[in-house]
Swiss-Prot record:
CDD domains, A to Z: AdoMet_MTases
Name assigned to this protein: Ribosomal protein L11 methyltransferase
Species classification: Bacteria, Pseudomonadati, Pseudomonadota, Gammaproteobacteria, Enterobacterales
A Pfam family hit: PrmA
Binding-site residues, S-adenosyl-L-methionine: T145, G166, D188, N230
GO biological process: methylation
Length: 293
């Protein structure tokens, strides 16, 4: 069915209050969008991550009298008479089908493909990870995930143990297992991420080789041949003492979730214990890799 969309711009601090106002005026759903397309990473459980400059979009039934809606909103103290807004008629579409059509199999490196379940596998002889978009976790579309997948694809992981620190969807741990790792360990602070990783591992037939832990439950003295952490620069810097002890001597470390402008400070945090490779950049993001001394 067709819909009517009303969009208004506000600050992150006021966005949720105005979303309530739109719902009270008859909106059936609310969407928050960043006006400047700033990337958002995995929010904490229960957190709504908003931006400084936020578009609040209310979706209304096509039969709604939008003059009445605007009149109601003009009474709100954050808006007032003549508040800036945009009303748009949305054509009738199969929105679920359109959403699905936006996701295609993606290749990383020489062997690895990430494929949505509703798409045909492009190469039956390749290493194929079946992963559907859903929860707010990595599916390979973000440059940092892509950088990590390409790195893993280029390693000889046969018989190795891999730790995915901040596992999210489990995409990196599952890819490592499909690429030949004997065992993978996923760690995340979010119980939803642990569940998403478990579900995705079962879908890919590797759940028997994947261990998943919240930080409070992870084994002491845990070690791995390869450690990958695709989180953010702040946690990578703060957790450097913890992450640095995870690789065995001579083991490999891969870090991403880092803006190119942050690379130097992250390198400084790990240089004492690792021989670091040249930084690899993709768009505005980068990957830092090295070997444990």
């Amino acid at each position: 069915m067709p819909w009517i969309q009303l969009k208004l711009n506000t600050t992150g601090a006021n966005a949720e209050e105005l979303s309530d106002a739109l719902m009270e005026a008859g909106a059936v759903s609310i969407t928050f969008q960043d006006t400047h397309d700033t990337p958002v990473f995995e929010p904490l459980p229960g957190e709504t991550r908003l931006w400084g400059d936020t578009d609040v979009i209310g979706l209304f039934d096509a039969e709604t009298d939008m003059k009445d809606v605007v009149a109601i909103l003009e009474q709100h103290p954050l808006l007032g008479a003549g508040f800036a807004h945009k009303i748009e008629q949305l054509e009738d579409k199969d929105w679920e089908r359109e959403w699905m059509d936006n996701f295609h199999p993606m290749r990383f490196g020489e062997r690895l493909w990430i494929c949505p379940s509703w798409r045909d596998i492009p190469d039956e002889n390749a290493v194929n990870v079946m992963l559907d978009p859903g929860l707010a976790f990595g599916t390979g579309t973000h440059p940092t995930t892509s950088l990590c997948l390409q790195w893993l694809d280029g390693l000889d992981l046969n018989g190795k143990t891999v730790i995915d620190f901040g596992c999210g969807s489990g995409i990196l741990a599952i890819a490592a297992l499909k690429l030949g790792a004997a065992k993978a360990i996923g760690i995340d602070i979010d119980p939803q991420a642990i569940q998403a990783s478990r579900d995705n591992a079962e879908r890919n037939g590797v759940s028997d080789r994947l261990e998943l832990y919240l930080p409070k439950d992870q084994p002491e003295a845990m070690k791995a041949d390869v450690v990958v952490a695709n989180i953010l620069a702040g946690p990578l810097r703060e957790l450097a003492p913890l992450i640095s002890v995870l690789p065995v001597e001579g083991g490999l470390l891969g870090l991403s979730g880092i803006l190119a402008s942050q690379a130097e400070s992250i390198c400084d945090a790990y240089a004492e214990l690792f021989t670091l490779d040249p930084v690899v950049e993709k768009e505005e993001w980068c990957r830092i890799t090295g070997r444990k001394k």
